[in-house]
């Protein structure tokens, strides 16, 4: 079974549409942080209206929408997003699970135990083993830090699919993953930049190394 893993779309409709034009898969997994961006309602409805097997999990920013609490996202961002979503759309976000399994692959947003936990490609194996404790999967696919990576933690292959809508990378574009069973291919799609003229904060940009160092510092503060 071919599965496309699209993570951290962040309301970036041009990036999503560019990726969807390339996706050839039996299942599309939406890995969380779907709406926190310039076009939240339009992005969610594009995904929900697809004539495809689309399965969602929640991310921390999705949860912050319906919990109406301060999280990792700036408050003005969440106010912007909530104001553009219908009550039905917010209830849909509320219904999303933390994880999803397809065969021997487990999909989660950040880690299997927490949608906000920060671990990176350079986090010590010991910390990843703690986060993966009890996981009975051959492959774990995550996102959250917007940087693609592929590493082995014990018997578990750990893959970060990257970010479709807000990647931290040297090359602008959309980053995602395509799985065929437990085989994984990290993918990149060229796309137009989103319209951020109404976006309330500066649209974030960083290289993968800069972002990894930043998130690793946050990770140490969390531990």
What does each model-identified segment do?
Residues 2-10, 104-111, 158-162:
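Active-site-proximal beta-strand elements of phosphoester/diester hydrolases
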Residues 4-94:
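Core catalytic region of metal-dependent phosphoesterases/phosphodiesterases
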Residues 10-15, 36-39, 61-66, 113-115, ...:
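Active-site environment of divalent metal-dependent phosphoester hydrolases
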Residues 22-24, 50, 102, 133-136, ...:
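Glycine-rich phosphate-binding loop signature in dinucleotide/nucleotide-binding domains
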Residues 71-76, 105-135, 167:
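Active-site-proximal segments of metal-dependent phosphoesterases and phosphodiesterases across multiple
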Residues 98-103, 151-153:
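Short acidic-hydrophobic surface loop/beta-edge motif
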Residues 122-151, 156-159, 174-176:
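Anionic-ligand binding region
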Residues 152-223:
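Acidic, His/Gly-rich catalytic cores of divalent-metal-dependent hydrolytic chemistry
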